C-alpha cells in the first residue's frame, strides 16, 4: 500500500544529475517518501529512482566498479532500504548510462537483489 508523500529535498548533485532526475520523475526539488525512505518519484503506482553518471567508476577492463569506488555499498544499502519500504510495490531504477545499468544489475544479482527493475533511458 502506497502511503507516502512528496517532500521538498535539497540534495547535493551535479546539474546533469538534477536534470536527469527531473526528466525521469517530472519533479524538481522533491522526493517521494514511502515508509520513511526516499525515492526520486512515483509514477503510475511504481516507485522510481534515477541514476545519473557512474561510468567513470567502472573499470573498462573488468566491466565492474573499481575496488576503490565506495558508492557500491551505498547503492546496495539504498536498494535494500527501498525494497523494505516498498513492501511489495514495484520499484524501477532508471539509468542514464547503459554500462552503469549492466554493472549495477550484475552487482545486485551477485547480492541476491532481484526486486528492482532496471530501465535504460538516455538523458535528453
Q: What do these predicted regions represent?
A:
Residues 1-124:
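Catalytic toxin/effector domains delivered as secreted proteins or via bacterial secretion systems
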Amino acid at each position: 500500500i502506497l502511503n507516502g508523500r512528496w517532500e521538498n529535498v535539497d540534495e547535493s548533485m551535479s546539474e546533469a544529475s538534477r536534470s536527469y532526475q527531473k526528466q525521469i520523475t517530472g519533479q524538481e526539488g522533491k522526493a517521494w517518501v514511502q515508509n520513511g525512505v526516499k525515492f526520486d518519484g512515483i509514477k503510475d503506482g511504481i516507485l522510481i529512482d534515477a541514476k545519473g553518471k557512474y561510468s567513470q567508476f567502472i573499470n573498462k577492463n573488468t566491466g565492474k566498479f573499481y575496488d576503490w569506488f565506495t558508492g557500491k555499498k551505498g547503492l546496495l544499502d539504498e536498494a535494500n532500504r527501498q525494497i523494505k519500504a516498498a513492501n511489495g510495490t514495484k520499484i524501477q531504477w532508471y539509468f542514464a548510462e547503459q554500462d552503469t545499468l549492466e554493472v549495477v544489475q550484475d552487482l545486485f544479482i551477485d547480492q541476491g537483489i532481484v526486486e528492482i527493475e532496471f530501465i535504460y533511458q538516455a538523458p535528453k
